[in-house]
Amino acid sequence: MLKAHKYKDFDWVLVGTAAAIFIVGLLFLFSAMYSKNIDFIIRQIAWFLIGALFFIAIININYRKIISLGYVFYFLSLILLLIVFFFGSKRLGAQRWLELGYFNLQPSEFAKLFITLSLIQYLTEHKTEKVVKNIVTAFFIMLVPFVLILAQPDLGTALMLVPVFFVLLYIWGVRLKRLFFIIGGCLAASPLGWFLLKDYQKERLMVFMNPDIDPLGAGYTVIQSRIAIGSGGVFGKGWLSGTQNQLNFLTERHTDFIFSVAGEEWGFAGGAVLLALYYILVRRAFEIARKTDDPCGVLAACGMATIIGIQVIVNISMTMGFMPVVGLPLPLVSYGGSSLLVTMIALGILE
């Protein structure tokens, strides 16, 4: 638990909950893809095993040593983001991936973790006396990779950095009044961001307000997702029996919209169980922060908890039409090696 690890102190609640979420996720993934391509299951398990190796390695390293390399990770993330900008493969209008033979790597996924570590290192090394100077510096630490990620374009991952940034500032000691002032300034400037968005991102924001304006185009996935979740009722249609899923009405059902599969086949009850597991996981992470006396450890635990928790909130809200589609995976559930590996590393830091 945020220290040089001793197995008698192993947090079985944290690890057991994460394992349960992953197993449930495999069931959803199998249902989403078994009639299409079973390779997705094999790859997901392979990534999990790789992630398990990283997890085991990290729990045997004092978390302070990992945080002390935050700036190294930061520059590594910038290098990876620049490489993908020039040499990355393009899918669905976005250039986010590096092809590595059988696997693909998404640098922006690693960047959100590495940037968090660099912010933690900076805030740990600087006191709160020079608040304005340190906030501005921390902001620019976040801003450079934010722009590179947004240029891919990957709006979801870029926006993920914002709540992490504010949570870390609050834990570090910035008063709420000052935080609200900064957030207000960001919100006031946010309309300018419209001009930085790609056309398909603008379409997503428009269909968020009214998916029916383009029911066969930009609004199609959200409409089908809401139909799937709504038709699941209380207990669902049964595993492998979701009509929206099995008849291929749901697009991206193995990645960003896998919760739609859960809602249709396992219903409200199944979705509630999954949400309860996530609640236990994130709450446990914040409990670790509460029990830690070291300011660096508190920042680390809260940072990892925020990365996981915000993704869950945004992804599930997105599938139900409560938020615009921004392309964030559901941690430990959505198909994707980079996301899974980053989550396993975050859990290793927490453990």
Question: What do these predicted regions represent?
Answer:
Residues 1-2, 29, 311-351:
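A juxtamembrane structural motif centered on a specific transmembrane helix
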Residues 2-19:
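N-terminal membrane topogenic signal
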Residues 6-7, 134-135, 247-250, 292-293:
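Helix-boundary and loop/linker segments of multi-pass membrane transporters
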Residues 15-221, 260-320, 345:
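Hydrophobic alpha-helical transmembrane segments of multi-pass inner membrane proteins, especially
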Residues 101-111, 151-153, 233-237, 328-342:
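Glycine/serine-rich anion-binding loops at beta->alpha junctions
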Residues 154-159, 237-242, 253-255, 272, ...:
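Transmembrane helix boundary and interhelical junction motifs in multipass membrane proteins
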Residues 211-255, 266-270:
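TM-adjacent membrane-interface loops and short helices in multi-pass inner/ER membrane proteins
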